[in-house]
Curated annotation (Swiss-Prot):
Residue intervals of the Radical SAM core domain: 165-383
A cellular component term, taken from the record's GO annotations: mitochondrion
Molecular function GO terms recorded: 4 iron, 4 sulfur cluster binding; lipoate synthase activity; metal ion binding
Protein known as: Lipoyl synthase, apicoplast
Originating organism: Plasmodium falciparum (isolate 3D7)
């Protein structure tokens, strides 16, 4: 086809117009995307200002670095923050503020994710723990190794291992060291087909516990969905052997949900244990982000409620990790749900990321907030609450729980 000079000129004009339109569209898209971000005044975190900037994003902001003074807004100096930062600030108000304005900030609810940016700055001072005393620590470690046992203290990289092992307390992990589930917060190794349970484990566990001469022991396990009863009979046999050797000892069993199998729950509930524990782990909204897809909030509550109904003499217990993006309102609601299902004891601790392949921490919760949750929980009627940054489900379980039981018993005698 032959084009004359006028035709080429018109094609050039048409091409220029198309490119111009494309540039305008691209620019508008970028501007639209930019305006969907939220901006807040740096150093001024008042509730009203946060909500104002969340609902009506202002494109005027103060860039970090050079040309600061050229980008001032009538409302004050504005810093452009990434979405994750603005959400973190807003969540702090929802989590720690006196007023509840979560309805306005529903779209800001945070979720944890592997690989997300961790909170800035060094780890708070309250996470510093003392080094273990060598003698007691080594003795306990040798006993566990000699009897081919596993502890959740080691497998889950618990920060309190030195403190607990120094006083001769360990949480023994039954059914091997490999879990059939893959929760995103847990460092225990996983497999869909782990080795069969060690038939000598119940006997070795009873032997170790008798040698340690302790008053309270916690038995836990990995999830074993590959076993017909989830490992309930193995648990029950261990409890029976320990109680036969030491009838006076108090036994807490921190178990899986057994996939909601009532027969498994019944088997364990009548084994002779004193405390039936199963962890909810997090608030309802965050379950799918934190736990394996086979676990869920309602099933966990059902298992604890069923255990109590089967054997009313049992104490039931659960635990929640904080710092995964939950709000204060959600934590309070979780406590209400636990009490509604007749759970006696609840513990709160700060989630700490085991490795970079696990969920990032969304927020460090202050000791004051842990104390607040404890006070609120006691008002709801929990028999005992352990709440603090380094508290874990099994952390000083005997010391806390026995002390509470004694106090409650003495109070009942007076009445």
């Amino acid at each position: 086809m032959h084009f004359g000079i006028p035709s080429l000129f018109y094609l050039y004009i048409l091409f220029s117009i198309i490119m111009r339109i494309k540039c305008v569209i691209t620019k508008n898209l970028k501007k639209t995307k930019k305006r969907t971000c939220s901006y807040i005044p740096h150093g001024n975190m008042e509730k009203g200002i946060i909500l104002n900037y969340i609902e009506k994003p202002n494109p005027a902001y103060l860039k970090r670095g050079k040309n600061k003074n050229k980008n001032k807004n009538k409302k004050g100096d504005i810093y452009k923050l990434r979405n994750v930062e603005i959400l973190l600030y807003a969540n702090r108000y929802v989590h720690e503020g006196n007023e509840n304005f979560s309805s306005t900030t529903k779209k800001l609810l945070l979720t944890p994710k592997v690989g997300n940016k961790m909170p800035e700055g060094k780890k708070p001072d309250w996470f510093h723990v003392a080094a273990p005393t060598v003698a007691k620590y080594n003795k306990l470690k040798d006993d566990i190794k000699k009897l081919n046992l596993h502890t959740v203290c080691e497998e889950a990289q618990c920060p309190n291992i030195g403190e607990c092992w120094n006083i001769g307390t360990a949480t023994i992990m039954l059914l091997g060291d490999t879990c059939t589930r893959g929760c995103k917060f847990c460092s225990i190794k996983t497999s869909s087909n782990p080795l069969p349970p060690d038939i000598n484990e119940p006997f070795n566990t009873a032997k170790a516990i008798c040698e340690w001469n302790i008053d309270y022991v916690v038995l836990t396990s990995v999830d074993r969905d590959d076993l017909p009863d989830g490992g309930a009979s193995h648990f029950a046999k261990t409890v029976e052997l320990v109680k036969f050797s030491r009838p006076d000892i108090l036994i807490e069993c921190l178990v899986s949900d057994f996939q909601g199998n009532i027969d498994s729950v019944r088997k364990l509930a009548f084994s002779g244990l004193d405390v039936y524990a199963h962890n909810i782990e997090t608030v309802k909204r965050l379950q799918k982000y934190v736990r394996d897809k086979r676990a869920n909030y309602d099933q966990s509550l059902f298992v604890l409620k069923t255990a109590k109904e089967i054997n009313p003499q049992l104490y039931t217990k659960t635990s929640i990790m904080l710092g995964l993006g939950e709000t204060k309102e959600e934590v309070i609601q979780t406590m209400y749900d636990a009490r509604k299902n007749n759970i006696d004891v609840i513990t709160f601790g700060q989630y700490l990321r085991p490795t970079k392949n696990h969920l990032s921490i969304v927020q460090y919760i202050s000791p004051q907030m842990f104390e607040y949750y404890k006070e609120e929980g006691l008002k709801m009627g929990f028999k005992y609450i352990a709440s603090g940054p380094l508290v874990r489900s099994s952390y000083k379980a005997g010391e806390y729980f026995i002390k509470n039981l004694v106090n409650q018993r003495n109070k009942d005698k007076k009445n």
